[in-house]
């Protein structure tokens, strides 16, 4: 849990809203509200990505936003999630991305804790798949 805000940080929340048919609720939007209202994180430090359908596209789409906003590709980013999901990201997600997306949009960095790991954006994330109708 964040105990303070560092003004050099940006928070990305990536979660698709339409995995529930007819739902108007979006986890990324709700998490943004929580960060602003409960943790006093400035709104301009929060970037949401509501299009990803699963972890492969979560990371790919976040890397695209990192590029779009001119953030450096040589600086580590941090994923924060459950322990099991974090282990999957660092151990098997690259192979899954290659299989499902035909590219790996990140390079693993250091494991920081059971629930946190570094990654570095990869330029391959910028490839658009013309056969994928939901590829933003």
Report residues per predicted region:
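A structural signal for short, hydrophobic/glycine-enriched beta-strand patches
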Residues: 1-136
């Amino acid at each position: 849990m964040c105990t303070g805000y560092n003004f050099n940080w940006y928070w990305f929340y990536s979660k698709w809203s339409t995995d529930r048919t007819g739902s108007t609720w979006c986890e990324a939007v709700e998490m943004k509200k929580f960060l602003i209202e409960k943790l006093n994180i400035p709104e301009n430090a929060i970037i949401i990505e509501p299009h990803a359908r699963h972890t492969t596209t979560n990371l790919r789409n976040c890397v695209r936003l990192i590029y779009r906003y001119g953030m450096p590709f040589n600086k580590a980013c941090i994923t924060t999630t459950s322990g099991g999901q974090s282990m999957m990201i660092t151990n098997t997600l690259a192979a899954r991305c290659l299989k499902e997306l035909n590219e790996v949009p990140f390079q693993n960095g250091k494991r920081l804790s059971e629930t946190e790991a570094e990654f570095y954006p990869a330029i391959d994330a910028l490839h658009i798949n013309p056969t994928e109708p939901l590829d933003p």
